[in-house]
Amino acid sequence: YGVQNLAYDAYTGNFYAAVYKGTKPQYPNYDLFVIDGHKKPKKGYITSDNKREKVELLTLAAAGEKSNDGTVRGWRFKWGATGLVPLANGLFYISHNKKTEDGQQQTTLHKYRWVGSEKDAFVLD
């Protein structure tokens, strides 16, 4: 698990985290998260390896779809885990990956514009 691509966008001041979609039913399993780059980390606790640890926590941007309990926000955007590059003025190159019939991995870059609405993170530019 984890973040496959993390990119800082100077235009918005935020960090974009593209991940492979999760499968755990207790989580919203978004593919894309935006970390609010304008907020300082806050001290808080997490549980890791059955131990409670005090850490600095980052804040997700107040945008995107809300999880059922309202604690997590993100987008269902299947692209970007294999490439996410901020360009300027809200534009990004985002990888569309695929596997060929003979098993080779490929990608095609597409130019997107950041919109950050509740339903759509990006639109093709």
Describe the function of each predicted region.
Residues 1-74, 80-83:
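Loop/turn-rich, solvent-exposed surfaces of beta-rich toroidal or solenoidal domains
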Residues 11-13, 88-91:
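Short coil/turn segments that connect the beta-strands within blades of beta-propeller domains
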